[in-house]
């Protein structure tokens, strides 16, 4: 598949982390990722033209073979803005909740979130995770209790039926809440891979006024994110790259933060009134939205140079 050429006067590809100079002699600030990396990861491949959101029109460069090609010039600029925002949050000792439950992003979300000690959800979004924090906190406490009983060998002393039941409960809680087990309060922002897939997370974050950073493909609504990163959310390499860059921003901010920045404020936890008034019943919101099929033809290979 032919790769659209990019105007050299707009951008001169260079290695990540190095300053660049355009043809006019202007110094371009250091990039958080190179254009070559974006191309090789297939970040520019969007969805088929018949499956798109018109609001993404401004981020589309062209169309090739029935597939939209995303404008990587904009992707690069917006990714740098998202990187800077994530860095600023980390500098203040804040936290970013990573969310990516689709198969293509599960690995990257877990690996990168753990690397920078951030909470994450990569199995399924439990309804009310943000809006019903009080109830979720009780479940997290239960998770820690079951982990302790297992580590101390207490579960082995129970009758077989009861032991199996508690181990099953532990497995389920670990899958759903393991990534947020150490989250003591609501995050300062949410980073989402695929807005269309993670509608529950989007709705809860927006209800609470939490900033949303998102990798947004051509079939999504960019208005649902505060920091839009236009790009392919169906290719593993694309997800890996974007998630890593956001994590790099957090890591850079953590290196500048002081220990005092990580001390939770007295009012860090949401007020009970807000938790009750805005809460979304956990049991009633268990069901996930149906995942967007990924069966469509979508180029993900490395473009020929």
Question: Which sequence ranges carry the predicted segments?
Answer:
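Residue-level signature of catalytic and energy-coupling elements of molecular machines
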Residues: 42, 98, 190, 242
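Intrinsically disordered, compositionally biased charged tails
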Residues: 1-30, 255-305
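Long, charge-patterned amphipathic alpha-helical coiled-coil/hairpin "stalk" segments used as oligomerization
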Residues: 116, 121-227
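Short phosphate-engaging motifs
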Residues: 104-105, 197-198, 235
């Amino acid at each position: 598949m032919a790769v659209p050429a990019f105007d050299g006067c707009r951008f001169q590809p260079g290695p990540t982390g190095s300053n660049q100079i355009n043809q006019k002699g202007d110094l371009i600030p250091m990039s958080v990722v190179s254009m070559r990396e974006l191309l090789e990861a297939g970040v520019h491949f969007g969805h088929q033209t018949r499956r798109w959101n018109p609001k993404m029109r401004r981020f589309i460069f062209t169309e090739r073979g029935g597939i939209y090609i995303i404008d990587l010039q904009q992707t690069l600029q917006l990714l740098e803005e998202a990187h800077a925002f994530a860095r600023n949050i980390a500098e203040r000792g804040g936290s970013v909740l990573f969310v990516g439950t689709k198969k293509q992003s599960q690995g990257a979300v877990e690996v990168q979130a753990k690397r920078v000690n951030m909470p994450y959800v990569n199995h399924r979004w439990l309804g009310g995770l943000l809006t019903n924090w009080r109830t979720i906190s009780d479940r997290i406490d239960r998770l820690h209790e079951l982990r302790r009983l297992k580590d101390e060998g207490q579960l082995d002393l129970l009758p077989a039926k009861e032991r199996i039941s508690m181990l099953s409960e532990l497995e389920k809680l670990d899958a759903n809440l393991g990534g947020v087990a150490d989250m003591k309060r609501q995050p300062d922002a949410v980073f989402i891979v695929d807005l269309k897939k993670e509608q529950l997370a989007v709705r809860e974050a927006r209800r609470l006024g939490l900033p949303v950073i998102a990798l947004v493909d051509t079939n999504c609504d960019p208005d649902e994110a505060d920091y839009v990163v236009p790009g392919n959310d169906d290719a593993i390499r694309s997800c890996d790259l974007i998630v890593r860059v956001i994590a790099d921003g957090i890591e850079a901010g953590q290196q500048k933060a002081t220990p005092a920045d990580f001390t939770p404020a007295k009012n860090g936890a949401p007020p009970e009134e807000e938790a009750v008034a805005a809460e979304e019943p956990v049991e009633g919101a268990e069901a996930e939205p149906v995942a967007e099929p990924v069966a469509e033809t979508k180029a993900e290979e490395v473009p020929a140079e």
